[in-house]
A protein has these predicted regions:
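Bilobed "Venus flytrap"/periplasmic-binding protein-like clamshell domains
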Residues: 1-46, 141, 160, 164-169
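Pocket-lining segment of extracytoplasmic ligand-binding domains
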Residues: 23, 28-119, 123-124
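Short, flexible segments with low predicted structural confidence
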Residues: 14-16, 103-104, 145-147
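Flexible glycine/proline-enriched surface loops and loop-helix/loop-strand junctions
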Residues: 1-4, 112-118, 153-158
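An extracytoplasmic/periplasmic, membrane-proximal ligand-sensing/linker region
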Residues: 39, 45-47, 56-74, 81-91, ...
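Catalytic-loop motifs flanking and including active-site residues across diverse enzymes
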Residues: 14, 125-128
Length: 181
């Protein structure tokens, strides 16, 4: 039973995301706990929360710490809810959290993610943004090696979840690299 859900710190991106996702999923009958990330982990560990939402990279340290003490059971989001979330909020994209992420996980877990964006002011010269974007893609292997979720960095998914206009310098690279038609 999800009676007490830690939805993230007040006015945070995690709180906004968790409330959006829970709303689309039709979950309303629970007590919202507006807690910081470490406090949410403590509440889970101590049995004072039934679930906690995290909008963070994985693996996430406090959850790793909990999984050492007690099994972690991530809640999968059903496919239909993932599709509805994507329709309502196109910047959320499907993601699968591997079962090897936290101790005690017995299966891969379907969820949603927000892509990280590298933003530039319109005042930054096009050539500078082009050069940085090109360098990022030239070094994908190094980026992938730097974090467990690096494997999700692909040319095919480069623009997935992007709902804002591209900087002209980035657009130039994406067209040149045939990522953007």
């Amino acid at each position: 039973d999800l009676k007490r859900v830690a939805v993230g710190p007040p006015a945070s991106g995690t709180q906004l995301a968790s409330e959006r996702i829970l709303s689309v999923a039709g979950l309303k009958d629970f007590r919202k706990l507006e807690l910081g990330f470490n406090e949410s982990a403590e509440y889970l560990r101590d049995g004072n929360a039934d679930a906690a939402a995290y909008q963070t990279g994985i693996p996430y340290g406090p959850v790793v710490d909990i999984s050492v003490v007690q099994p972690v059971d991530l809640l999968a989001i059903p496919d239909g809810v993932i599709q509805e979330i994507g329709k309502t909020y196109p910047f959320y994209v499907p993601v699968t959290i591997p079962r090897t992420t936290y101790k005690g996980m017995s299966r891969d877990v379907k969820s949603v993610a927000v892509k990280m964006l590298l933003l530039a002011s319109a005042k930054v010269p096009d050539e500078d943004v082009y050069t940085v974007t090109k360098a990022l893609f030239a070094n994908l292997d190094r980026l992938k090696a730097s974090h467990k979720m690096g494997e999700t960095l692909t040319r095919e998914k480069a623009l997935e979840g992007v709902t804002i206009p591209l900087h002209p310098g980035a657009e130039k690279f994406y067209r040149e690299a045939a990522i953007l038609k």
